[in-house]
Amino acid sequence: MQTFSNINLVKPSRDWRVEKGDIDENNSGSINNRPLSPTLFSSNSSNNNNNNTTNNYIAVNGNLVLGVNGVGVGEQAQSLDIAVENPEECILWYYNYFLGKSHQNYLGTLDNGDVFGASIKKEEYAIEGEYSYKTIIWTLEGIERQWFQLKKHASTTPTDIIKKALPRLQIKKIKEIDSPDLLKDFKDLEQTQTEINYKFGLLLARPNQSSEDDFYNNVEHSPKWTEFLNLLGDTVVLNSFKGYRGGLDVNNNTTGTHSLYTSLKGYEVMFHVSTMLPHSKADSQQIERKRHLGNDIVIIIFYDCDPSDPIIPWDPSTVNSNFNHIFAVVRPADENNYHVEIVIKHGIAKFGPVLPTHSIFPKNSTFKEFLITKLVNAQRAALNSAPSFATKLKRTFKDQLESIYKKHSSSSSSLSFVPKRRSSSVSNINKGRELKVKDPKYGSGFFKLLSKDSNKTQVFDTEILFSKSLNEKINCLDVVESDENNSTLIVATEESIYLLKSNMITGEQLFQKIIVMKDVIRLTLVKPLKILLVLTGKGLCFFEMDTIFQQFNNLSTNSTIPSSYAIPIPTTPTTSNNNGGSGFFSSNNLSNGHTSLRWSKSGIIAAGLINNNNNSNSINSINSNNNNNINNSSINNNNGGNTNILAPSVFLSVNNNNNNSGNNIFNNNNNNNNNGGLNNSSENILTVIGEDSIKVKKIVGTKGCTVYGYTKGDNEGQEEDITLLYVGLKKTLLLYEWNKGEFVKSRELPLMDNIKTLCAIAPGMICVGIQKEFLLIDIFTQTIKELYKKSDSEPVKALSLDNEILLCFNNIGIFVDESGNKTRQFELKWGSTPSSLALVPSYVLGISGPLIEVRTLLNGNIIQSLPANISLSNDDCNLDNHYHHHEIINNCSAINIVNNQLSDNIENINNLNINNNNGNNNYNNNGNNSNGGNNNNNNNNNNGCNNSLINLDQETNNLMSENSNNGAENVYSFSTFNDIAHVDNGNIYVASSSKGLSCILRIKQNIQLNVLPSPSSSPLKPSLLLPPSPL
């Protein structure tokens, strides 16, 4: 019996390449095919600041680009990252985010004579003083979508915004067009670029057959063939079929009576099954069958044979069709598995998902999902990169755009600039909504299809690690330690530095202020030196981590009243007491009032004070002075009674509150609460540093520094190894060396322009971004080499990978080697300019203000955008991943209060007063006097979405009543620690602050899903596999 590794289903051909799992035939010259070598640069640089990310794998032996879920030695399972690439192509930006909303449309010409269009949507951004701009640039090369922020005081013209979105455009003339017809033209033009329905051919082959004519003449079904068809889809009756028909006759049965149909992730697929199409004995070439399958871009060839049967390898060079570009050849490997090889015509770009080792699949739904996803990506890759398709599609799009320009340029109403932005008028907004109602195909219904079972196929999962109402924004963070279940982070806000310890299993957390320091821009934990490096507007300084941990332990474990007091994190949503009175927390399920506590080794983490409806109690107050302590306050219920808090190390703190009533625990913002209530102080966790202050050590000569990086010669941190610190100070690059507990300046190098970004490559070697270009600098020899230059773009970030460097200009990412030569044929086209980059095996993440993009390193395509909406529910603070379009663009992230209850993970929403009179709750942002009556949820900011959990079906039905300012206040701004976010064990931590709510998110690859077992007769090759993800 043949083994899986030496069976060839396809004969090698000069014009075709073959993917078979561990070998990429005819592709030995690919840059991704070079074996891994010891890392040249990044293992000791600050860009991998935890010094355990040396395995920045790009590829292993061709297409084996497994994620962090790779297989280790002795394991018999592989995980599959199954994702449709570039899903935003099916999320019509103009249809969903512009049409029916206030926006401007422009048409213009470039210096070279080409025409272009632009659509701009301006919104209030979550960060005060900034506007958010969504832009669509319609060029002859295609559609470019960008999302970015600009300062309100910045003087921006339409040309400035368009240049920001697409810097390479050299605009000669532009004008705003006020025409309802242009709304429809742009909507229709975008839809021509969207493909959500697919037709794939299915050919039956026998063991002794090798030609297409033999395949097309097969008629009889067999159990193996029927089993394969049933796995792929459902047999449907064509007569009166209402789904996507793929060119088949659904009225007169001229193309057969039945066919095979399926839908997956919102995409409809009709298979052209050769044995279900009409067969003519008199026609040896079966022209009627070829009329359908011959026009399909993707074909599946299934060999109906036993695993032991020898087959003649199929020769793809015998294909006669000009349309057939990708073939999936499948045969039974044994009773429970299939063997698959993918045949691709040369000239087509690479696409995923990547085949597993030996390409053996079990006969289950995972195989169906993988195969159809692979074929969907294959057809898209062929249309975009195969010359025969791409040239024709580009020419068609060019003709359509030029026709639109000619149509509206000749209109007398469009010959001049529109002075008052009439394209934002009510009439145009209503016209857009009417167009959406008339054509709902790409609206809510499609989104709902896309979201079906989406959580099962997410490559990356996002979870909220921490959320809190703070009056200070989280600026940056770094990781002390992290694993699957625990994490310790250092978090810097606008006012202070905190230490956050979390247990993901128990939900226990401790968020402790340790240093009061304003305006921290960036911080880095330098583990070999055991220091915390901090950048502020006054320059660089550092703290000894041992002192920080000692301070943290003193503050968090002392069983007596320490010099810091922390408000306990609530564990139960606040509810009303049906018997009257006001309780901190109430419960209908408990018979006696008690204190709910969460403990950890470092002390109490959260405490919820629970009062029972039947026993109205009050909590004895803690008496202390007015200075940063509780002022003789308590919570009283109408029926009296007392419950003592017997909980050591639980302390409450406020800022000099003025309590007008003995029934108030907290009083702030001059609020008056007649029957007792909870008023949050302006800072929900207040910590006063103890007498033993933490000493700060300044790094002389760094005032005005904007960027920095470091390298360490040895990961183990040997004392004799010198740590080098690189500092960008305006037009000067400074070098500091660690010497006896201090950073001492040893060299400086003047440059011709201000340093915008820098990336440590190796000891003494730095990649520096200045205006329009990146430089490679050897600071010891003072050698400056031009690495890569783009005259129309600004450098943003650089990231050192194994054997190559990722350079980001505005919204373009380019891979180069140390000589500046491109190492990859593709570019990363970010949807929003990244402020940070994170690298995990097989993927790179771009973190920007509005969203996080996950792109595959196989071809640069986007496979996921995250996180989706952050919302509050009565159970938890959740990431709403339900609707697929929210994963593509975080268009409306609203803080949501469901059923008048706050999440137990969101503590003390800013300026929230809760007064319970006669069992009624009031939620008010401005602190109203509440004497009872009705349930109120008052919010004076009504400019944005009020509910992030949008019912998209209702959205389509209610288009005429939409708020034109939808989304104005509900977009979250994401920031991350340092220049990247890659941390221990593949965990990525990102901070988000918006409207007083601060969150820390953990992103990790989904290791629970799509695990592909390998049969015992197919031993894996450990040498070709990435290391397993630690648990």
From Swiss-Prot:
Annotated organism of origin:
Dictyostelium discoideum (Social amoeba)
A GO biological process held by the record: regulation of small GTPase mediated signal transduction
Q: Which InterPro entries match?
A: CNH_dom, Rap/Ran-GAP_sf, Rap/Ran_GAP_dom, Rap1_Ran_GAP
Top-level taxonomic group: Eukaryota
Give start and end of each CNH domain. Answer: 471-881
Q: Where is the composition biased (Polar residues)?
A: 26-41
For whether the record's keyword set contains Methyltransferase, the answer is no
Cellular component GO terms, alphabetical? cytoplasm
Q: Which residues does the annotated region (Disordered) include?
A: 18-48, 920-950
Q: Does the keyword Manganese apply?
A: no
Q: Which Pfam families match?
A: CNH, Rap_GAP
Q: Which UniProt keywords apply?
A: GTPase activation
Domain (Rap-GAP): give its ranges. 186-404
What is the name listed in the Swiss-Prot or TrEMBL entry for this protein? Answer: GTPase-activating protein DDB_G0291510
Which GO molecular function, any one, fits this protein according to its record?
GTPase activator activity
